Amino acid sequence: VYRAFFTTYLPARTVMAVAALPMDALVQVEALITNGEGTIPNEPQAGDLVKYVNNTHNAPYHALSTQTVAFSHYNNITGQLPIDPATGKMVEGGVAEQAAQCLKNIKAVLTSIDVPFDDIVKVNVFLTDLADVDAVNEVYTRFFPDSGIARAVAYMPARTIVPVAALPMHAKVQI
């Protein structure tokens, strides 16, 4: 069904399990839409909004999603699971090791498109157990802020922590 709607490119996506959805729905889809009103940085708008998609072998890849989709001044990254791209398997260890791998995967995707890690403005963290927040926070502060300039101003992106019933591959965290 997904490919029937996205025939020319695959948008970034995040998959999670929740305890319940409104009106007893079985599936809920969130979409970030652009109608073409916007410009590519430093370029005039010429007709349809250009979308750039990118996948790198330095982060996990899924056949039904693109790692990053850029449009206008925005770039959306698919939710990253704690998968080691070298093995295709989830990293060993607990939630701290999993959170670190998620952030390493995000950094690899950004590096592949020459975007600094500190350009991230919003992060969603999906956790299967809210008791793991402190462990995730400890790892998170090893990654943010990343650059000297960001450290000088104590930059941290906006962040939302979402409790979920389950994640793919029985992961404890997805970022």
Each predicted region: which residue ranges?
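N-terminal presequence-like segments and the immediate start of the first folded domain
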Residues: 1-104, 108-122, 126-175
